[in-house]
Regions:
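GIY-YIG nuclease catalytic motif and its immediate N-terminal context
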Residues: 1-55, 59-74, 80-83
């Protein structure tokens, strides 16, 4: 089983929000974020996946997710590279 870290961005161009998360099934998780069952921070917005990275171990994925959540500059660099 693979583990993914992903970055979501709002579809609404007026609010420039991003969200970093972890999942083993990114598409299913995106559907939850776009419904009322997503993380509290993502409710009320429609999201698209702009970045995902695959890992073989959960611990490496969680460590990378933590680093993206704590390092805004690193996250913004990835967002700029992905357009």
């Amino acid at each position: 089983m693979y583990h993914y870290v992903y970055i979501l961005k709002t579809l609404n161009g007026f609010t420039n929000r991003s969200y970093v998360g972890y999942s083993t099934n990114v598409i299913s998780r995106l559907n939850k974020h776009n419904s009322s069952k997503g993380a509290k921070a993502t409710r009320g917005y429609k999201w698209k996946i702009v970045y995902k990275k695959r890992f073989n171990s959960k611990s490496k994925a969680m460590s990378f997710e933590y680093s993206l959540k704590k390092d805004r500059k690193k996250r913004l660099t990835i967002l700029k590279e992905t357009g």
